[in-house]
Each structure stands twice: as structure tokens, then as C-alpha cells.
Amino acid sequence: EYSFRKMGQDQLRLMTFLGFHRFHLIGHDRGARTAYRMALDATDRIKSLTLMDITPTHFLLDALKSEVARAYYHWFFLAQPSPFPETLIAADADYYFESCLLGWGGSRLEQFDQHALEAYRKTWRDPATIEAMCNDYRAALEYDFDMDECDLSRQLDLPALVMWGEGGAMDKSFDLPET
């Protein structure tokens, strides 16, 4: 299972194993969604919370805007039933993932460290990796939305910092201080 709750539980077990009962928690993008769920589920373990570049999953999906749908198309593509997205991606995994890299972070592949890029390519060519990526996004639509809906009225009682990129898809689409 790839729900943010399950991933958060895995991380809580790891922190316990490492000897940290309470800790500061920082997350970006998917990691921020996991951190948000961890803070809801285990508030007593979190000293402070920093979230970067997200809107809560329920809010994002419930108030979906065209700008976000275009920028985050992969949420809906990867969440389609198996083996649809896996088959399309596997047909040319380099093309798909390099397009993602160019759309999300760089303007040319030469801007990426070539050793890191080769490690990425080796990983994303693995059918099990592609399936896991799809399952992560399936969980957001199958489980995470409903979990967040159950917690809509909850407020966290801990120090928190929420940051986002000015001019990014979230900034353009939502009144982030109000979310």
C-alpha cells in the first residue's frame, strides 16, 4: 500500500529504530504530503512541521483548477488502472521520465549530473519501479483523499511553517495562506 498514512507509518518506525521519539519534520512535494499525514496521525511525535510546495491533497482534488490539472496531469495519468499507464510508460520510459524532468526542473538534460541521470534511467526502466510509481498516485485518489476528508475539521497544535514557490502552479491557483 502506498497511502501517505502507510508511508508515514514506515517513517515513524524508522525514526523509532533510529532512537528519535520526537523530531522536527520537513517535507517537500510528495514528502510534504506524507509529513502532513504523519502530523495528523502522530501529532505527539512531531516537534514542528515544515511543508513545502503543497496544498492538502483533499483541498487540491476537491477544488481542482485547470492550471493545476495541466501542471499535475501525471496525478491522473499514473492513477489509472493497471496496466494502462505502466504499459505506455514502459514503451519508452526514457522519453516519459526525461519529459518529466525537463518540465519540472531543468530546461536541458545537460543540466543534470550525468551519473545521477544514468542512475535515474536504470531505475525508471525497471517495470517494478514504474508500477510502484503508479501505485503511489493511485493511493492518493483511492485512500488519501478519503482520509483527508475525515480530518477536514482537525487543526494541528504544533509549530508549523508552510512555504511555496512564488509563481508556481499552487501559488497561481489557490489562496495558499487561506488553505
Where are these regions (language model features)?
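Flexible "cap/lid" subdomain of the alpha/beta-hydrolase fold that forms the substrate-access gate
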Residues: Y2-I26, R30-T179
